[in-house]
Amino acid sequence: MIEPEFKDGLLPVIVQDYETLEVLMFAYMNREAFDLTCSTGIAHYFSRSRGKLWKKGETSGHYQHVKEMRIDCDRDCLLILVEQDTGACHTGYRSCFYRTIEGDVVGEKTFEPADVYKN
Amino acid sequence: MIEPEFKDGLLPVIVQDYETLEVLMFAYMNREAFDLTCSTGIAHYFSRSRGKLWKKGETSGHYQHVKEMRIDCDRDCLLILVEQDTGACHTGYRSCFYRTIEGDVVGEKTFEPADVYKN
């Protein structure tokens, strides 16, 4: 296996749908998240804002099933191809990149956040 | 236009082929690189290792012509869809993500670095 380089303990990760090739989201893994992703096949990340490990889908149930992992030429960025349950974005869109920079909505809404995130 | 958020002066950027949807590379823009990309339609980045602005293709001639820019839900990551001249990676592959984490080569080689990078 090619060993990724964690800069300041973190590895940037691009998440892409393995069938449609839509880019779904961008996040970071620390060593623990990377190891858990490899061992379980479910994407785990490190939340910089919350300062802790984050199993994607632990609240929403929208897990990411990892089909393939690729690493870039410098070994400091990861591309993972996943099967995404329902949607990746907390706003209800399948992809976090659902808007152009001009503000046009180009993504597909796949769930209602109010139905999923209940306190 | 939706204003991106530059954390510590930098914005992570995912670069995707606008036709094949192949993820080509990952880089960072500072404010100057972002503005130049918007005004010229040619991708510019900020090289963290060299500490300076970097017009992609300035040495190789392999420019990236920006077709669309998308921003994520948090406005702190950019996805740009480009027409890539020849190849994006300095190793000669079209994409920097030409290997799986297991080390299998899955990308296409599109040029010989020795022919392109001459001192």
UniProtKB/Swiss-Prot annotation, chains A, B:
Gene3D superfamilies: 4.10.80.70, Phosphoribosyl-AMP cyclohydrolase. Mg(2+) binds at residues 72, 74, 76. Its EC number is 3.5.4.19. Pfam families: PRA-CH. It is found in: Cytoplasm. Its cofactor is Mg(2+); Zn(2+). The keyword Magnesium applies. It comes from the Archaea. Pathway: Amino-acid biosynthesis; L-histidine biosynthesis; L-histidine from 5-phospho-alpha-D-ribose 1-diphosphate: step 3/9. The keyword Metal-binding applies. GO terms for molecular function: magnesium ion binding; phosphoribosyl-AMP cyclohydrolase activity; zinc ion binding. Keywords: Amino-acid biosynthesis, Cytoplasm, Histidine biosynthesis, Hydrolase, Magnesium, Metal-binding, Zinc. One of its GO terms (cellular component) is cytoplasm. It catalyses: 1-(5-phospho-beta-D-ribosyl)-5'-AMP + H2O = 1-(5-phospho-beta-D-ribosyl)-5-[(5-phospho-beta-D-ribosylamino)methylideneamino]imidazole-4-carboxamide. Zn(2+) binds at residues 73, 89, 96. GO terms for biological process: L-histidine biosynthetic process. InterPro entries: PRA-CH (IPR026660), PRib_AMP_CycHydrolase_dom (IPR002496), PRib_AMP_CycHydrolase_sf (IPR038019). Binds 1 Mg(2+) ion per subunit. Homodimer. Belongs to the PRA-CH family. Catalyzes the hydrolysis of the adenine ring of phosphoribosyl-AMP. This is Phosphoribosyl-AMP cyclohydrolase. It comes from Methanocella arvoryzae (strain DSM 22066 / NBRC 105507 / MRE50).
